[in-house]
Amino acid sequence: MYGKIIFVLLLSEIVSISALSTTEVAMHTSTSSSVTKSYISSQTNDTHKRDTYAATPRAHEVSEISVRTVYPPEEETGERVQLAHHFSEPEITLIIFGVMAGVIGTILLISYGIRRLIKKSPSDVKPLPSPDTDVPLSSVEIENPETSDQ
């Protein structure tokens, strides 16, 4: 049962991470006029240029929170352009290993907590009955009717 719970938690985390990576949340208020997205794309001669795309909310589309999917711009050839990363390779590697260690540590911590909750403490365990069951445990002596008739 706990394995199923952990599986569902891991699956929901994967879904939420993939949802965050494909969507972007933009805050719009009535005073905001535009949301600007900048992408760095490479030209054919390997020099970089900055493309700016502005999205202006219309008066009837203004909301507190709107979720929209933002795709990278396409070049004239119709191919998508890879975005430039702000981190170097060692930093990205450390980030990935850090996230992996965090997820594995969380799973181990949850399983340790579950094991501690399932395990009974020695005070909760009832003692085994004594092998000498002939002797009654009450302090009141009961008269035996067979011996009283004599």
Swiss-Prot record:
Organism: Homo sapiens (Human)
Further comment: Involved in several unequal homologous recombinations or gene conversion events, predominantly with GYPB and more rarely with GYPE. The resulting fusion proteins are observed in different phenotypes and encode low incidence bloodgroup antigens.
Subcellular location: Cell membrane
Entry GO CC: ankyrin-1 complex; cytosol; membrane; nucleoplasm; plasma membrane
Residues found modified as Phosphothreonine: 133
Similarity field: Belongs to the glycophorin A family.
UniProt xrefs under InterPro entries: Glycophorin, Glycophorin_CS, GYPA_B
Region (Disordered): 121-150
Residues with attached carbohydrate: 21-23, 29-32, 36, 38, 41, 44-45, 52, 56, 63, 66, 69
Topology of this chain in the membrane: Single-pass type I membrane protein
Mutation effect (residue 94 to I): Diminishes dimerization
Effect the entry attributes to changing residue 102 to L: Abolishes dimerization
Signal peptide: 1-19
Phenotypic consequence of residue 46 to E: In Ny(a) antigen
Subunit (UniProt): Homodimer. Component of the ankyrin-1 complex in the erythrocyte, composed of ANK1, RHCE, RHAG, SLC4A1, EPB42, GYPA, GYPB and AQP1. Interacts with SLC4A1; a GYPA monomer is bound at each end of the SLC4A1 dimer forming a heterotetramer. (Microbial infection) Interacts with Streptococcus gordonii hsa protein.
Protein's name in the database: Glycophorin-A
Task performed by this protein: Component of the ankyrin-1 complex, a multiprotein complex involved in the stability and shape of the erythrocyte membrane. Glycophorin A is the major intrinsic membrane protein of the erythrocyte. The N-terminal glycosylated segment, which lies outside the erythrocyte membrane, has MN blood group receptors. Appears to be important for the function of SLC4A1 and is required for high activity of SLC4A1. May be involved in translocation of SLC4A1 to the plasma membrane. (Microbial infection) Appears to be a receptor for Hepatitis A virus (HAV).
Ranges facing Extracellular side: 20-91
Main location: membrane
Highest classification ranks of the organism: Eukaryota, Metazoa, Chordata, Craniata, Vertebrata
Effect of residue 66 to Y: In Vr antigen
